Swiss-Prot record:
Disulphide bridges: 77-402, 109-114, 169-216, 218-223, 264-277, 266-275, 303-320, 406-431
Region annotation (Involved in apical transport and lipid raft association) ranges: 11-33
Organism: Influenza A virus (strain A/Puerto Rico/8/1934 H1N1)
Protein name: Neuraminidase
SUPFAM superfamilies: Sialidases (SSF50939)
Domain notes: Intact N-terminus is essential for virion morphogenesis. Possesses two apical sorting signals, one in the ectodomain, which is likely to be a glycan, and the other in the transmembrane domain. The transmembrane domain also plays a role in lipid raft association.
Cofactor: Ca(2+)
């Protein structure tokens, strides 16, 4: 091949390569243009697609969080006894599982579910940080909640509020939580509605502001709670707060110079609120306060000679004022009023937190004798108990035409009565039924000490 032929051949090859490159570039440009056109077309239809997606998500959300107003206008359901509702076995499970060290558990229900609320100690059972958790008030305590009947663990629990004293309730539209924390001489109650801070209440007597350790009560969109500030062994200050969507709309201080109200157990009944409380000053029977939605109130003591506090004397002649015998100190408790009659929940022991029983005194709200017609045992005298409190299931949850009364019992284990480094509790609960029930004991059942205690 002569030089001219070589030049022509090389030139032809370059021309072909150039043409191929040009065709590829043109194809690339066309491809980009088509892709851009498709994206532009998609953007032009975004409103329709997104509208479909939003409609679907909104429909699902509404289905899961249907809002109602819990009116609280129903009367308590007629009942013959108490059926076991839940038992969490948290200390038994906590010997080998990740379970919170807690105290002061309580239950509250919305129109969709019931949850167990509790005050953690910022520690797990059988762990070094459980040491010293006998202490009531510390910066590590928090109000948390989990589905009723489940052992409270980091995996199923929801943080509610930093607190060493607390209450919570649902108005049908959202959860109200009240968490008190801070120093004894200046604690603050933080109110949250659906998890958002809405209000704070400062200690007004600077002597350990404290609240119910059980559910607040909601009526027609308003929720009501009672707080105490002042001595635990003398006259203190007691206030009722009316709260709407987390904001305090009204409050009053009780005029109760010879009464002592702590750790009240409250429930709605025919549009009003009834609270049965602890007298830690001088009463072995329980004080009560009843009020309407305007906070017009009445006060008194359960008259029955079947005494409800601990410590307490032998049953005998009661009083519609404080029964002073063995009246000092006390334990959180509850009762349910039915006209002149009353269901009284109490420890079986007169002097220690052992056992638990329900007593029906058909005239006990107004009469002072100690005659009763029903006794139902739920925790044996030989087993530990502790605090107890009321909660209700609204008709919007149960489908009944009345308010179902329920109660929970705290089963305290550990210090100061047992040889452990920790103090914690499990819980059981019962609801009133108008059918057959049974006497039995549903104890905590954990075998102590744990390995951390040895």
């Amino acid at each position: 091949m002569n030089p001219n032929q070589k030049i022509i051949t090389i030139g032809s090859i370059c021309l072909v390569v150039g043409l191929i490159s040009l065709i590829l570039q043109i194809g690339n440009i066309i491809s980009i243009w088509i892709s851009h056109s498709i994206q532009t077309g998609s953007q032009n239809h975004t409103g329709i697609c997104n509208q479909n997606i939003i409609t679907y998500k909104n429909s699902t959300w509404v289905k899961d969080t249907t809002s109602v107003i819990l009116t609280g206008n129903s009367s308590l359901c007629p009942i013959r006894g108490w059926a076991i509702y839940s038992k969490d076995n948290s200390i038994r499970i906590g010997s080998k599982g990740d379970v919170f060290v807690i105290r002061e558990p309580f239950i509250s229900c919305s129109h969709l579910e019931c949850r167990t609320f509790f005050l953690t100690q910022g520690a797990l059972l059988n762990d070094k940080h459980s040491n010293g958790t006998v202490k009531d008030r510390s910066p590590y305590r928090a109000l948390m909640s989990c589905p009723v009947g489940e052992a409270p663990s980091p995996y199923n629990s929801r943080f509610e509020s930093v607190a060493w004293s607390a209450s919570a309730c649902h108005d049908g539209m959202g959860w109200l939580t009240i968490g008190i924390s801070g120093p004894d001489n200046g604690a603050v109650a933080v109110l949250k509605y659906n998890g958002i801070i809405t209000e704070t209440i400062k200690s007004w007597r600077k002597k350990i502001l404290r609240t119910q350790e059980s559910e607040c009560a909601c009526v027609n969109g308003s929720c009501f709670t009672i707080m105490t500030d002042g001595p635990s062994d003398g006259l203190a200050s007691y206030k009722i707060f009316k709260i709407e969507k987390g904001k305090v709309t009204k409050s009053i201080e009780l005029n109760a110079p010879n009464s002592h109200y702590e750790e009240c157990s409250c429930y709605p009944d025919t549009g009003k609120v009834m609270c049965v409380c602890r007298d830690n000053w001088h009463g072995s029977n329980r004080p009560w306060v009843s009020f309407d939605q305007n906070l017009d109130y009445q006060i008194g003591y359960i008259c029955s000679g079947v005494f409800g506090d601990n410590p307490r004397p032998e049953d005998g002649t009661g009083s519609c004022g404080p029964v002073y015998v063995d009246g000092a100190n006390g334990v959180k408790g509850f009762s349910y009023r039915y006209g002149n009659g009353v269901w009284i929940g109490r420890t079986k022991s007169h002097s220690s937190r052992h056992g638990f029983e329900m007593i029906w005194d058909p005239n006990g709200w107004t009469e002072t004798d100690s005659k009763f017609s029903v006794r139902q045992d739920v925790v044996a005298m030989t087993d530990w108990s502790g605090y107890s409190g009321s909660f209700v299931q609204h008709p919007e949850l149960t489908g009944l035409d009345c308010m179902r009364p329920c109660f929970w019992v705290e089963l305290i284990r550990g210090r100061p009565k047992e040889k452990t480094i920790w103090t914690s509790a499990s819980s059981i609960s019962f609801c009133g039924v108008n059918s057959d029930t049974v006497d039995w004991s549903w104890p905590d059942g954990a075998e102590l000490p744990f390995s951390i205690d040895k």
